[in-house]
Regions:
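Intramolecular chaperone/auto-protease modules of tailspike-like proteins
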Residues: 4-117
């Protein structure tokens, strides 16, 4: 397994999630879906496996709906390259460990609010 550096001495601007970020995280927790990769369906047909995950475009929209830019967060990725035909291509993605941490922050905030009642 990979160890993620988490040393306070290597971080700055350490803060709790804002209300808008917590709203995004709550929304993201509802967006997980099952799907099949198109290239695997083309290769394997009905034998292509089903996966569980989130759609990066929906992640991007959830941030936008709260007035935030997903590209400012490490959980969201956007890679652009030029294909063999000279056309620019973009692929969006997520870093699941960061996504799960982000979502966990909203769960913890909701539990804390419930405990306070």
């Amino acid at each position: 397994s990979t160890i993620q550096t988490s040393d306070q001495n290597e971080k700055q601007d350490i803060a709790s999630a804002t209300a808008k970020e917590l709203n995004v995280a709550k929304k993201l927790s509802t967006l997980f879906k099952t799907f099949k990769w198109k290239d695997k369906v083309a290769e394997k047909g009905d034998k292509a496996r089903t996966h569980t995950g989130i759609v990066a475009q929906e992640v991007q929209l959830a941030f936008k709906e709260e007035g935030l830019d997903a590209s400012n967060y490490g959980l969201f990725t956007s890679d652009t390259w030029t294909n063999d035909d000279g056309k620019e291509q973009t692929r969006l993605g997520v870093r699941y460990p960061e996504l799960f941490s982000f979502i966990f922050s909203s769960i913890e905030a909701r539990l804390t609010a419930l405990d306070a009642k």
